[in-house]
Amino acid sequence: MEFIPAQTYYNRRYQPRPWTQRPTIQVIRPKPRRSRPAGQLAQLISAVSRLALRTVPQKPRRTRKTKKQKQVKQEQQSTRNQKKKAPKQKQTQKKKRPGRRERMCMKIENDCIFEVKHEGKITGYACLVGDKVMKPAHVKGTIDNADLAKLAFKRSSKYDLECAQIPVHMKSDASKFTHEKPEGYYNWHHGAVQYSGGRFTIPTGAGKPGDSGRPIFDNKGRVVAIVLGGANEGTRTALSVVTWNKDIVTKITPEGSVEWSLALPVMCLLANTTFPCSQPPCAPCCYEKKPEETLRMLEDNVMQPGYYQLLDSALACSQHRQRRNARENFNVYKVTRPYLAHCPDCGEGHSCHSPIALERIRSEATDGTLKIQVSLQIGIKTDDSHDWTKLRYMDSHTPVDADRSGLFVRTSAPCTITGTMGHFILARCPKGETLTVGFVDSRRISHTCMHPFHHEPPLIGREKFHSRPQHGKELPCSTYVHTTAATTEEIEVHMPPDTPDYTLMTQQAGNVKITVDGQTVRYKCKCDGSNEGLITTDKVINNCKVDQCHTAVTNHKKWQYNSPLTPRNSEQGDRKGKIHIPFPLVNTTCRVPKARNPTITYGKNRVTLLLYPDHPTLLSYRSMGRIPDYHEEWITSKKEISITVPAEGLEVTWGNNDPYKYWPQLSTNGTAHGHPHEIILYYYELYPTTTIAVLAAASIVVASLVSLSLGMCICARRRCITPYELTPGATIPFLLGVLCCVKTAKAASYYEAATYLWNEQQPLFWLQLLIPLSAAIVACNCLKLLPCCCKTLTFLAVMSIGARTVSAYEHATVIPNTVGVPYKTLVSRPGYSPMVLEMELQSVTLEPTLFLDYITCEYKTITPSPYVKCCGTAECKAKNLPDYNCKVFTGVYPFMWGGAYCFCDAENTQLSEAHVEKSESCKTEFASAYRAHTASVSAKLRVFYQGNNITVSAYANGDHAVTVKDAKFVIGPLSSAWSPFDNKIVVYKGEVYNMDYPPFGAGRPGQFGDIQSRTPDSKDVYANTQLILQRPAAGAIHVPYSQAPSGFKYWLKEKGASLQHTAPFGCQIATNPVRAVNCAVGNIPVSIDIPDAAFTRVTDAPSVTDMSCEVASCTHSSDFGGAAVVKYTASKKGKCAVHSLTNAVTIREPNVDVEGTAQLQIAFSTALASAEFKVQICSTQVHCSATCHPPKDHIVNYPSPHTTLGVQDISTTAMSWVQKITGGVGLVVAIAALILIIVLCVSFSRH
């Protein structure tokens, strides 16, 4: 990066530059060789000692006393003498000896900074740092050095900096820079600079414009920052600086910073002569003395950058600068006046020319405040003085005062007026469909004006509340700030048109008398030829009638607002002025309520929320897996909601509270180490589908085997009894009859035999009942004695990305991309003791590369005052304005309050214009359309290495290496090139949306992008709002038009939930810059280069023998819910690494201290019901066996710290039951097969 200087410091400031022999050219330097640092230090100490030991003379004290005594006499002297004394006192106050820090900086700055001048004035400074010369980009002018002025500078608008390579012969003058900035005090030209909380601050007044480019030094004389400007924060001023953080240059810009380059005079124009805008040539050029000439001069310079300086100078009427106050903010209104304009509804259902006509209603503030523009002026009296309690309105041709207390605003109910100034009113109103403004004049007559206006206070946050709470949460919002100071917002004003007034004419016999009443009147009569002119005294028109004349009052001493409800001055044309308006829209924070915490009940893979909303509150939740499955619902009354918690986790947001996160535990009601029904219940609650499938398959297999056994027995029986059935008179042997259950002719039924035994021989009856029980006991004993008939069935494949063992110090491993879960890896190297590395992701940031296409916001339609051409035809001129429309309408006959505006009936034309501009709210309320490209991934990793926990940050690209002590770590790239951002995204107020927006220059009316601009402050604007001018209504002066509604406001209503709530994998979306944080997707490979010195040889490590492991308790799928006791004997005292060689078991302790014969307790975490794992301590391994029980908590608020298994394992108890059941069924099948084989063999032998 070009803005990072290299360290080419030769210590010239503290010791002489090393001497080098020049071959031929001898360079003679005019500067004397500086002394060594020790000499400088001695001089400084001696100077400080002399200052400390010097006695303070008493004479100045007497002088001060005499001055105080003379002040009483000076008060009695003339004002002329006082003016002469004042400059002398100021000069004596300026003479102040620099402090120690200032002297030190001046000494260091002697070589390394150079003045930047423009037209002989110092506008800032350039500084030599490292191998670069650096100058703030906003400082205009050239460096006051012949060699540096010729350099080609590279400019960075991002850092507001220009830099170039230092000439070789000047490198010795450069200062060293550093990125080390511990909190404390630093030095600059004006004294001490405090660095705290990442900000540089100074006492207010210590810095000023012209200090831009000055360096800030540490106590070693190294540059830590370069000053660009400052922001006044009361007693302290926060500095805007460019500084360095390791290898990265950064810019610190506090809010409200002002550039500290010396302001250059801005020039204005008057009669082809330029002059400084702050010093008009007519000395003094004062509005009170020459109002018309002053307004004309301002109109000529309305597009000049120094227009407002010229306006202030014309109104101040003084060459001396005065302190600004609230009254001065109202001073600009002395050049304007209120006016009468057309109102569609004056309160009784009819239109009129109202003194409180509504011009514009602004509702961009998200806190619900309305900004209303009307035709009267508030806070100004008719004598142009300021008075908060008054307002002035136009009554006929004359402004009249009224009390401000009579002003009111109303929608569906009365509104609360929160601020007034000039033409503007701030009000907080309830929702409604119309807006009415009105006032009561001095004669107690009420004037109102009503407009259709749909008002609904916007929603801030996720709760629909009605009043601000005392306690809550601060959310960003926007409001109209209550300040009357000059802002960047402005309105256009122009000369008022001639106002027709037929009451000035009276008919006297055959003549017309015009009574001017102290006004300037323009008249035109069509009798005995053309008779027209401009008069200031009464005039009589002979041989004429009133109907043949037209009179209008003209006034060019004041401006009025450029309203579409009043005509444009026909003589002035497009001439106009501008004035600042109050109450700008600013970003702020609003306090919103926080909903009551819900009552939470945890169930198996479910969470139940009992909600108590005080007002309509939004509930939303999403899964933190691949498919977010986002849901939201407005809750208006008490309600109980049950939500399923997926294995990946659940995020629930209730109102304005912070999100709640839940993860399910593998909890069940059964146990994996109990009876068959408990085991079945255990697995059924964990994995119902798999359990049902396995049980169904096992049942089918058992049923098949039993059926097979029965079939073989039936076949053997049939083989045995068939020969006897075919032989006449054959008798079946008793034993065969018993085995084959053959019923003899004399045998009774089982019921008859049982009845007989019960009646005659009860002991035999009980013996017969014991036969099946004896058979069952015999079968069980056979199963116990039967060797294992089948091998253990494996129902799952334990998959894990656990530890890997390598035999080299170049180690590579893969860790899951899950934040907050520790991961351990074992590094084994022949001849060395094993080393355990523990790594834990603190955060993972995915930041896409963005390209800003445009910003869009709300537009405003500019409709200047229409140009009415009386008795003629007007023509449109092409103008390069966004969505510009111009139309000429013929046959108009407009009226003003004093009568018809034109003398002609049908030959009049009206030229209507309209175009679109960005609204004033675009500086705060806008959406940015970005194209997103390849994303970079950075990770913050905690590494436990050599007994220390160290946190490092690195780019996870597989190339960027970071050093942890003496080991080198290379992280990435991610296994999955996934991003939550689409190719096109929209950013609005800290929220990000995936949206396929229209490209630049292709916006459609009423949709997102109907107005487009490159930046909020740029002048290039594209607009397509379907603006169509319409014919004005007969008799009224207005500019009607049709236009599509704002696409930006429509998008705000329909935009839906942002990526903050809908992104998969639990991503947290942030802005400035746009990034996704902690997306749990994929794996991250890590390559580790460990030096030989980090390993411990086996001969140096303690030897551990006689190890035994006993698990005291174990709860699987819990946060280190297992505890094992390992007994050992160590050869010597030392430290041993502890590691689990089983993938599915994680041990919390990375290493332990061993000594002699002792025991240690280790905590482990596993997802296995029966954990069989090996623990390695130093180079010795021991086998551990654990019987784990399910956790008691169904839901927890942290992710699992162990390896998650897709399917649970089979416990040893379950396997024992499987073996028994399988062996029993197998034995039955084997016996049946044996019987069948014997029967078949006997049968075949007889034949």
Curated annotation (Swiss-Prot):
Region span, Transient transmembrane before p62-6K protein processing: 720-740
Name the domain of life. Answer: Viruses
GO MF: serine-type endopeptidase activity; structural molecule activity
* Topological domains annotated Extracellular: 325-691, 748-762, 809-1223
Provide the residues annotated with a glycan attachment (glycosylation).
272, 587, 949, 1078
**How is the polypeptide modified once translated?**
Structural polyprotein: Specific enzymatic cleavages in vivo yield mature proteins. Capsid protein is auto-cleaved during polyprotein translation, unmasking a signal peptide at the N-terminus of the precursor of E3/E2. The remaining polyprotein is then targeted to the host endoplasmic reticulum, where host signal peptidase cleaves it into pE2, 6K and E1 proteins. pE2 is further processed to mature E3 and E2 by host furin in trans-Golgi vesicle.
According to UniProt, the reaction catalysed is:
Autocatalytic release of the core protein from the N-terminus of the togavirus structural polyprotein by hydrolysis of a -Trp-|-Ser- bond
Annotated region E1 fusion peptide loop: where?
A: 892-909
Location of region: Interaction with spike glycoprotein E2: 154-159
Site-annotated residues for Cleavage? 260-261, 324-325, 747-748, 808-809
**Which residue stretches belong to region Ribosome-binding?**
86-99
Annotated region (Interaction with the capsid protein), positions in chain: 715-719
Active-site residues, Swiss-Prot/TrEMBL: 138, 160, 212
Give lipid-anchored residues (S-palmitoyl cysteine): 720, 740-741, 1241
- The ranges of region (Disordered) come to 52-103
Q: Where is the composition biased (Basic residues)?
A: 59-71, 81-100
> What are the TM regions of this chain, as residue ranges?
692-712, 763-783, 788-808, 1224-1244
Where are the annotated segments for Functions as an uncleaved signal peptide for the precursor of protein E3/E2?
261-273
Q: Name one GO biological process term.
A: virion attachment to host cell
All residue ranges annotated as the Peptidase S3 domain in the record: 112-260
Q: GO terms for CC?
A: host cell cytoplasm; host cell plasma membrane; membrane; T=4 icosahedral viral capsid; virion membrane
The UniProt comment on domains reads:
Structural polyprotein: As soon as the capsid protein has been autocleaved, an internal uncleaved signal peptide directs the remaining polyprotein to the endoplasmic reticulum.
Q: What else is known?
A: Belongs to the Old World alphaviruses that usually cause fever, maculopapular rash, arthralgia and myalgia.
Protein's recorded name = Structural polyprotein
